[in-house]
Amino acid sequence: MTQNRICSLLGIRYPIIQAPMNWVSGAALTAAVSAVGGMGTLGPNAGAVKINPDVEATGELARQQIHKVRSLTDKPFAVNVTVGFGEDMKYSKKIMNVLVEEKVPVAIVSVGRPDVYTETLKKAGIKVLHAISTPRHAQKAQEAGVDAVICEGFEAGGHKGFTELTTFVLTPMVADAVDIPVVTGGGIADSRGILAALALGADGVYMGSRFMVTRESESHENVKQALVRAEDVCTVSVPKEFMLARDLQNTFTEKFLELQKSGAPTEQLNNYLEEHGPYRAQHLGEAEDAEIHSSQVAGLINDIPPATELVESIIADLKKRFAALEEQMSVFA
């Protein structure tokens, strides 16, 4: 029987990875996804209730969350390391050291070069998945020794590069560019997206926004309800100084884009972003006047289930769709 490469690499039952989300994916969500057979991932500021610039405190909070996940499940899980640049790298270095000390099974590395922490993590026996946005970056990650790459299309929520390659185009490009396993994300919320991803050459899927709207998610109830109410054209791409972000359309995005259009200086734009950042939405419940990262799949989200039920329902539906697709393929025989 042919084994799925991501399942074999990570020791999981289903090739479904819950993407790390800032202020959202804490121990409860991570453990729930891992326990049901996928791979949960602790995101930045997991378990935090306020913004804390202290590096040591940030590292210790990550350690506490790792311990909490292990108290809830014995299944493999991942922790996100956002490499960053310049002064911000002091945070990622601390998180990386905690991962090594705690012998975390998997690290999902993003927002930075793949050669920064890969060697150290792998020497500690940690599997490394690196997030990229182009085939060229995927090749560089492979050369740096990562175990798998994660490609995210233009549909994806949150921060990404300035390229506008959609998941449908990016996935086969990356699959052709590297020999290591490929996980794809951006616009995937249900069994249809997973089926498409596998057909495009991916070994697994990376789902964020759909898991944001689950009971275990640390996202504020106001934000969850905003995503449930979201209609078809509900997100917008927001250009920032160093990268793009895809956000749920609200008063925040309208005002920010108006400031950009008016020619506001970079300092003013950055101050506005800081004053209306995701923390205000995810923990204070300001679903209108703060930034909410979201994929275009928000228009497909209609309920707030437990993460376990979500995964189980996706797998059950996926089996039906595989059978239906096999029937449809008979026309090509």
Question: What is the role of each PLM region?
Answer:
Residues 1-177:
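Active-site entrance/lid segments in N-terminal catalytic domains of soluble metabolic enzymes
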Residues 70-97, 183-192, 242-256:
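Electropositive, surface-exposed helix/loop patches at the edges of structured domains
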Residues 161-183, 189-333:
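Conserved active-site-proximal phosphate/metal-binding subdomains
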